[in-house]
């Protein structure tokens, strides 16, 4: 409501005051909008504050400067702060939709083309999974007072829209003590008593007061005026609420009314002429009032028309927005039919979770697989197994399907199927809780027990248990496909009863057994051949996996590589394998899924075997050489065991348990600390956890985490890996410690225990990787600097291959080459010198206790980033700026987590498919071998990315034009169909030749790294 402060009461009745009222000016609302960002959701995390300007503010990567998430585009959103009315609106600009969180309201998904008004204390998440920032809006509650002429007009900010749009203003008088509201009413004088009566009635309807022109009717007029005043007050209140009324202008006061009376102040009657003149004046005044009322009515009609037009426009905009949303939904549905979305599931409160997180007590980690991580917990005094499902395997559109699956899992009851107990939201991830079996997985039993400790009868009984459990799942309604059947997903109790587990991510097929599903959740060695060619999953896929499990139980071995691609299509069988077992394995692993038996048929054969064994009293234990030619009494130095204790140097403490080799070791411990492996090659590089300070988590993934910290005053990069380290991996780290080259990230040390270990490496800086360079700065690439980068990349791999022993990278991608520059190295050295000065005392103490440990320095004076993962470079991608001169970039190769040495003892591990499938050489699928020429194939794919980006100024993923259900299917196309990336027609012939030679199907024909470097130098000479 507006209030009027009188500056001069004597001039209240002058007509100028009424005319000036429409010209009152309003001062804008002063609005201050600040955004508050937190790096982490915990309460102790520091807060970054960013104040918005009046007008348009772009929010995106680099705006504000500390916002550097790669998932946020540079023009992700726009926030507009209005200077006139103080409104704050949010417009979505980027592809990743933002989400608005408001108290007591459901989250609002921001879409492009729709503006959303922001309120104080709103929270906005710029994409799914990001930490939301808060919005704080401060406004002046009222307009500033403006004194104009004879009065001061003050308006509340809440009435802004009404007073701006209304043709007139609501006016009230104020006093120094209390503010009272009186309606100022126009006075219309009539010519005669009859007119007085009619006018009184009319004025009552129009909220106006009439004064009579004789003394006899003065009292009545006064009463009418009072009544009309009351009516006006009520009407004014209603008008203020509806914001639609036309308010009367201020008119003459009672002083003018006295001048309009027919009797002079000295009580002398007027003459007829004077009365006639006075009547004429009154008629003229009445006409003016009527004209004014007509104009006011026209203004009201125009205002209503304007409001109707605005409403009509808003309705049209809403209809257009709805049409756009419908089109977007249709496009999304069409897109989902061709390609599955990889967006994580949002676990909502509506999911029926029956176990609370605070009811679970963590005991230990059991392991991790393709579909999730398994840990042992205690729930209400009972040991349970909890599987946390990887977010990347769940999608937003699968919520209803998951709830349906959970409802069916609760109904499963079979002695050979693990009991499903419920679901839980654990650390923000969805978890499935099942019963816990003491002996662990079948793989644990086969690894920890000697072959002679399990009789043939017990092994067949275990196979019958597996077949019975799988037959129950396949004959359930609807049928349940496991998709990841292997020894790790079969649990064993104390009596060697086996139960099928880890089918929490299996999907239900509604069309019967003939239907198939295409959700990949398997492990390579157990995958049936039809899955590779895109045929999808049927129940016969589980039968193939069971054939591999049958081979595991008989041999105690663990399969490696893609068995289905071998000439046999199944693992190699021992020469003395019983014929009945050999036949069953071949039937289950038949390349034609239609010729494989179902589990009902498998059960009949297994029970027949079991009865024959018992009837013949053939309970002899399997001889240790029945399925192996290996000697159990091997020396420690030749051991390839992944679980035992291997000690080649002096070790303090007591070693408990028996030390064996060839996968026959028990879970032995050192000082009760679990499996411990200490080699002479690595003991000087073992770092104690308390020597790493100022640790900061960069990113957390399913099987590892990337951190940064300080070691002896220098910034280091830390890759923390879930799972224990085995003797061969420890020996590998010992060789990596000897790498000292400006072309490779330097290994500093390792921190390890029984459950996990961490690799400590030098810190390269925040310049990102070759992949981020191509994605963000493709326009800066030319043939000169591109070929220079290609030469450096090739030289870094050449260094590894010429190392003694030769090192095969086996995980070459465009993201495993980090960027550094001389300028950045100098700045980092200065920072490290300061850190060294501040931590001299700590370093001295550490040196006294660790005289043999590496000092973590760099012979070249460089402090560079270790990193072994794609995620590390993604977090630093946004920090690549124009300050990094591409012509001065230095390449450092990293990510040796999958590297292997080209030695005879590593022959088996070299057969396993590692790394990114898009870069994997075809011989891994067809020949199951890996050599230095395999690295050259992967290197050629990286060079293809680099040269294509330079040529087209746009980065595209290899095989982007090929439609795949899963990335691993590309191996089938490159191996069986000889598919290769498409080279642009205008690519220089010299470059095309290098690429095509590098990815020859016959690895022997691929050029050496020396040849590639020579040809690149020739290309630079010709093209530059």
Curated annotation (Swiss-Prot):
A GO MF term: ATP binding
Cysteines paired by S-S bonds: none
InterPro entries for this protein: Kinase-like_dom_sf (IPR011009), Prot_kinase_dom (IPR000719), Ser-Thr/Tyr_kinase_cat_dom (IPR001245), Ser/Thr_kinase_AS (IPR008271), Ser/Thr_Kinases-Pseudokinases (IPR051681), SMAD_FHA_dom_sf (IPR008984)
Enzyme active site: 484
Catalytic activity: L-seryl-[protein] + ATP = O-phospho-L-seryl-[protein] + ADP + H(+); L-threonyl-[protein] + ATP = O-phospho-L-threonyl-[protein] + ADP + H(+)
Organism of provenance: Dictyostelium discoideum
Protein name: Probable serine/threonine-protein kinase DDB_G0271682
Binding-site residues for ATP, renumbered to this chain: 366-374, 387, 651-659, 719
Keyword Repeat tagged: yes
Compositional bias ranges of the Basic and acidic residues kind: 250-261
Pfam families assigned to the protein according to its UniProt record, in alphabetical order: PK_Tyr_Ser-Thr
Keyword set, alphabetical order: ATP-binding, Kinase, Nucleotide-binding, Repeat, Serine/threonine-protein kinase, Transferase
Location of the region described as Disordered in the Swiss-Prot/TrEMBL record: 187-261, 823-874
A GO BP annotation: signal transduction
Comp. bias regions, Low complexity: 190-244, 823-851, 862-874
Domain of life: Eukaryota
């Amino acid at each position: 409501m507006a209030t009027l402060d009188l500056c001069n009461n004597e001039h209240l009745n002058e007509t100028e005051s009424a005319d000036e009222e429409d010209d009152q000016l309003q001062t804008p609302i002063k609005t201050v909008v600040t955004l508050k960002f937190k790096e982490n959701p915990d309460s102790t995390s520091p807060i970054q504050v960013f104040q918005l300007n009046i007008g348009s503010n772009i929010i995106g990567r680099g705006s504000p400067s500390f916002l550097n998430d790669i998932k946020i585009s540079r023009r992700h959103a726009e926030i507009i702060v209005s200077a006139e009315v103080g409104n704050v609106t949010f417009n979505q600009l980027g592809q990743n939709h933002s989400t608005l969180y408001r108290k007591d309201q459901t989250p609002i998904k921001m879409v492009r083309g729709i503006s959303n008004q922001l309120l104080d204390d709103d929270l906005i998440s710029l994409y799914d999974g990001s930490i939301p920032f808060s919005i704080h809006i401060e406004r002046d509650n009222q307009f500033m007072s403006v004194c104009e002429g004879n009065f001061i007009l003050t308006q509340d900010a809440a009435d802004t829209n009404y007073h701006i749009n209304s043709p007139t203003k609501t006016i009230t008088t104020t006093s120094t003590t209390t503010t009272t509201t009186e309606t100022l009413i126009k006075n219309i004088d009539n010519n005669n008593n009859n007119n007085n009566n009619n006018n009184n009635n009319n004025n009552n309807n129009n909220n106006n007061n009439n004064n009579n022109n004789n003394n006899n009717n003065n009292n009545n007029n006064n009463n009418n005026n009072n009544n009309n005043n009351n009516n006006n007050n009520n009407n004014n209140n209603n008008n203020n609420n509806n914001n639609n009324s036309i308010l009367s202008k201020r008119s003459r006061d009672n002083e003018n009314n006295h001048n309009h009376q027919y009797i002079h102040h000295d009580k002398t009657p007027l003459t007829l002429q004077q009365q006639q003149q006075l009547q004429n004046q009154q008629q003229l005044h009445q006409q003016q009032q009527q004209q004014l009322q007509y104009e006011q009515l026209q203004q009201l009609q125009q205002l209503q028309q304007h409001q109707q037009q605005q409403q009509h426009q808003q309705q049209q905009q809403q209809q257009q927005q709805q049409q756009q949303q419908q089109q977007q939904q249709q496009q999304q549905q069409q897109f989902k039919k061709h390609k599955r979305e990889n967006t994580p599931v949002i676990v909502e409160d509506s999911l029926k979770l029956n176990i609370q997180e605070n009811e679970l007590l963590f005991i230990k980690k059991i392991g991790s697989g393709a579909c999730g991580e398994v840990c042992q917990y205690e729930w209400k005094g009972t040991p349970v197994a909890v599987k946390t499902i990887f977010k990347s395997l769940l999608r937003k559109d699968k919520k209803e399907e998951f709830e349906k699956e959970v409802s069916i899992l609760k109904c499963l009851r079979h002695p050979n199927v693990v009991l499903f107990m419920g679901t839980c939201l654990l650390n923000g991830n969805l978890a499935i809780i099942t019963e816990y079996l003491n002996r662990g997985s079948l793989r644990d039993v086969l690894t920890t027990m000697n072959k002679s400790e399990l009789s043939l009868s017990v092994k067949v009984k275990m196979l019958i248990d597996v077949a019975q459990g799988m037959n129950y799942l396949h004959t359930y309604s609807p049928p349940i496909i496991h998709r990841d059947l292997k020894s790790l997903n079969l649990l064993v109790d104390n009596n060697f009863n086996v139960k099928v587990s880890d089918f929490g991510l299996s999907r239900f097929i509604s069309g019967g057994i003939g239907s198939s599903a295409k959700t990949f959740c398997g492990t390579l060695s157990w995958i049936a051949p039809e899955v590779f060619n895109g045929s999808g999953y049927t129940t016969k896929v589980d039968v193939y996996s069971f054939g591999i499990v049958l081979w595991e139980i008989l041999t105690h071995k663990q399969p490696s590589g893609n068995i289905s691609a071998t000439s046999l299509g199944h693992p190699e069988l021992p020469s003395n394998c019983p014929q009945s077992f050999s036949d069953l394995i071949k039937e289950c692993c038949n390349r034609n899924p239609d010729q494989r038996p179902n589990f009902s048929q498998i059960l009949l054969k297994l029970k027949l075997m079991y009865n024959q064994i018992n009837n013949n009293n053939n309970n002899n234990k399997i001889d240790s050489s029945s399925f192996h030619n290996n000697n159990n009494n091997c020396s420690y130095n030749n051991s390839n065991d992944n679980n035992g204790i291997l000690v080649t140097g002096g070790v303090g403490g007591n070693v408990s348990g028996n030390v064996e080799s060839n996968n026959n070791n028990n879970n032995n411990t050192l000082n009760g600390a679990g499996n411990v492996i200490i080699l002479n090659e690595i003991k000087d590089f073992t770092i104690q956890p308390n020597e790493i300070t100022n640790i900061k988590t960069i990113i957390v993934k399913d099987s590892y985490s990337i951190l940064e910290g300080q070691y002896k005053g220098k910034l280091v990069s830390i890759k923390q890996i879930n799972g224990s380290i085995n003797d061969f991996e420890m020996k590998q780290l010992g060789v990596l410690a000897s790498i000292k080259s400006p072309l490779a990230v330097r290994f500093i040390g390792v921190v390890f225990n029984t459950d996990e270990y961490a690799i400590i490496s030098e810190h390269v800086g925040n310049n990102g990787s070759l992949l981020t360079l191509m994605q963000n700065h493709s326009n800066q690439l030319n043939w000169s600097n591109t070929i220079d980068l290609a030469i450096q990349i090739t030289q870094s791999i050449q260094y590894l291959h010429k190392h003694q022993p030769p090192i095969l990278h086996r995980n070459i991608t465009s993201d495993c080459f980090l960027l550094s520059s001389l300028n950045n190295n100098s700045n980092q050295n200065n920072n490290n010198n300061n850190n060294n000065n501040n931590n001299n005392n700590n370093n001295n103490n550490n040196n006294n206790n660790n005289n043999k440990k590496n000092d973590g320095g760099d012979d070249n004076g460089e402090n560079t980033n270790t990193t072994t993962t794609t995620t590390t470079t993604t977090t630093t991608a946004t920090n690549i700026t124009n300050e990094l001169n591409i012509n001065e970039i230095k390449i450092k190769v990293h990510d040796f987590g999958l590297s292997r040495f080209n030695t005879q003892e590593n022959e088996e591990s070299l057969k396993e498919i590692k790394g990114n499938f898009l870069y994997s050489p075809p011989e891994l699928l067809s020949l199951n071998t890996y050599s230095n020429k395999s690295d050259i194939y992967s290197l050629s794919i990286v060079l293809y990315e680099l040269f294509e980006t330079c040529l087209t100024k746009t980065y595209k993923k290899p095989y982007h034009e090929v439609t795949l259900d899963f990335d691993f299917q590309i191996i089938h196309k490159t191996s069986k169909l000889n598919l290769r990336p498409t080279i642009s027609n205008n690519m220089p012939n010299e470059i095309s030749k290098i690429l095509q030679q590098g990815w020859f199907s016959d690895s022997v024909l691929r050029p050496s790294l020396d040849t590639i470097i020579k040809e690149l130098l020739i290309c630079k000479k010709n093209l530059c």
